[in-house]
Design a protein with these regions (language model features):
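Short Gly/Thr/Asp-enriched flexible loops that form oxyanion-binding sites at enzyme active sites
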Residues: 66-76, 135
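Short, glycine/charge-rich flexible loops or terminal/linker lids adjacent to PRPP-binding catalytic cores
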Residues: 77-119
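Conserved G/P- and acidic residue-centered "switch" motifs that form tight phosphate/ATP-binding loops
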Residues: 123, 128
Length: 176
C-alpha cells in the first residue's frame, strides 16, 4: 500500500488553545477509525523499523497504544506501557511530569531489560515534556533508547528541539 500523506493529514484535527490557552490538542481518532489510514500508519512505521535493532516498543498511554500495538505485532517485538497512573501493586519507577492532565509517568520496574534496545512510541509530540519524562523512565530501567517515534510532531511547539536536547532521534510519520 502506498503512503498517502494527504489522506493521513486530512484525518488529523488540530485544536489550538484547547484544552487551555497556549496548548494544542491533536485528535487522531479518525486515523484509527479509517482502516485504510490505520494500515498506512502502521505500515509506515513497520517499514521504517523492520531492519532496525529494536528489542521492545515502549508506548505512552493512552492514544499511542492502538498504533503501537499494531507496530509491535508487525515487528514481532514485545510491547510495554508507560502509564499515567500506577495500576497494580507491583514496583514501579516514577518520574514527575509537568503535563496538563497528570503529574507523573510510571513504568513497572521489571518491564525493560538492561539489554533492550527500545523504540519509544508516542502518538503526538508537542512540547516534548512527555517524551522527556518517558525517556528518563526507560533509561532508569537500564534499557537503551534507539529512537523516539510519533505519528505527529508539531515543529512549532518545541518537542523536536527537546528530543535533540536529549540526544535522541525523533521520527515523526507526519510533521506540521
Amino acid at each position: 500500500m502506498v503512503f498517502d500523506d494527504y489522506l493521513i493529514k486530512s484525518l488529523i484535527t488540530r485544536y489550538d488553545n484547547f484544552p487551555t490557552d497556549g496548548v494544542s490538542y491533536i485528535d487522531l481518532s479518525r486515523l484509527a477509525s479509517s482502516p485504510k489510514a490505520f494500515r498506512m500508519v502502521i505500515d509506515g512505521f513497520v517499514q521504517n523499523y523492520i531492519d532496525a535493532n529494536i528489542d521492545r516498543i515502549v508506548a505512552i498511554e493512552t492514544n499511542a497504544l492502538p498504533f503501537a500495538s499494531a507496530v509491535a505485532y508487525g515487528l514481532n517485538v514485545p510491547l510495554s506501557f508507560i502509564r499515567k497512573y500506577k495500576r497494580t501493586p507491583e514496583k514501579w519507577y516514577k518520574e514527575l511530569h509537568s503535563g496538563i492532565n497528570y503529574e507523573a509517568l510510571y513504568i513497572r520496574e521489571d518491564e525493560c531489560k538492561s539489554t533492550d534496545n527500545v523504540l519509544l512510541f508516542d502518538d503526538v509530540v508537542l512540547s516534548g515534556h512527555t517524551i522527556s519524562t518517558a525517556s528518563a523512565l526507560v533509561r532508569r530501567s537500564g534499557a537503551t533508547i534507539n529512537e523516539i517515534c510519533c505519528i505527529v510532531a508539531l515543529a512549532d511547539c518545541g518537542g523536536v528541539a527537546q528530543a535533540q536536547s536529549l540526544d535522541l532521534n525523533l521520527f515523526p510519520l507526519i510533521s506540521f
